[in-house]
Amino acid sequence: MAAGLFGLSARRLLAAAATRGLPAARVRWESSFSRTVVAPSAVAGKRPPEPTTPWQEDPEPEDENLYEKNPDSHGYDKDPVLDVWNMRLVFFFGVSIILVLGSTFVAYLPDYRMKEWSRREAERLVKYREANGLPIMESNCFDPSKIQLPEDE
């Protein structure tokens, strides 16, 4: 079984080398184990057909290279003056406006999730309760006397 698969893969390898125009060595191999003989196939002598149509230049002109005209091109415009101005505008708005003003905006945002306010409020409430002799924490979050319940029917 294994020798048969090896013979098949050897034939495929020789055929692939022949179709690509690679020189294939004509080899005859005999296995001492199963008496299998591997020889090059008839496909090994065939060459790929030559192209019938001659190669032609591309009739469409290629894009002009902006770097031949303007070696300092930044890729924004064909005109060198507009190219430099567009580059300056992009970098001005990209760096100055977005980075500087954006970071200033983030720095002055209000308290995120009100963490600072809740801490200050808790400290104020603890001071008030200690000053008036009340317990620091109660089991009731709301004053039970102010809660109005519906009447039982």
Swiss-Prot record:
GO cellular component, one term: mitochondrion
Chain segments annotated as transmembrane: 89-109
Source taxon at top rank: Eukaryota
Pfam families hit by this protein: ESSS
Matches recorded under InterPro entries: NADH_UbQ_OxRdtase_ESSS_su
Expressing tissues: Ubiquitous.
GO biological process, one term: aerobic respiration
Membrane topology qualifier: Single-pass membrane protein
Cell compartments where the protein resides: Mitochondrion inner membrane
Residue span of the annotated presequence: 1-29
Keywords of the record: Cardiomyopathy, Disease variant, Electron transport, Membrane, Mitochondrion, Mitochondrion inner membrane, Primary mitochondrial disease, Respiratory chain, Transit peptide, Transmembrane, Transmembrane helix, Transport
Basic and acidic residues: compositionally biased ranges: 66-76
Region (Disordered): 40-76
Similarity-based family: Belongs to the complex I NDUFB11 subunit family.
Assembly with partners or alone: Complex I is composed of 45 different subunits. Interacts with BCAP31.
Function summary: Accessory subunit of the mitochondrial membrane respiratory chain NADH dehydrogenase (Complex I), that is believed not to be involved in catalysis. Complex I functions in the transfer of electrons from NADH to the respiratory chain. The immediate electron acceptor for the enzyme is believed to be ubiquinone.
PANTHER family: NADH DEHYDROGENASE [UBIQUINONE] 1 BETA SUBCOMPLEX SUBUNIT 11, MITOCHONDRIAL, NADH-UBIQUINONE OXIDOREDUCTASE ESSS SUBUNIT, MITOCHONDRIAL PRECURSOR
Disease annotated for this entry: Linear skin defects with multiple congenital anomalies 3: A disorder characterized by dermal, ocular, neurological and cardiac abnormalities. LSDMCA3 clinical features include linear skin defects on face and neck at birth, lacrimal duct atresia, myopia, nystagmus, strabismus, cardiomyopathy, axial hypotonia, seizures, corpus callosum agenesis, and dilation of lateral ventricles.
Entry protein name: NADH dehydrogenase [ubiquinone] 1 beta subcomplex subunit 11, mitochondrial
Provenance organism: Homo sapiens
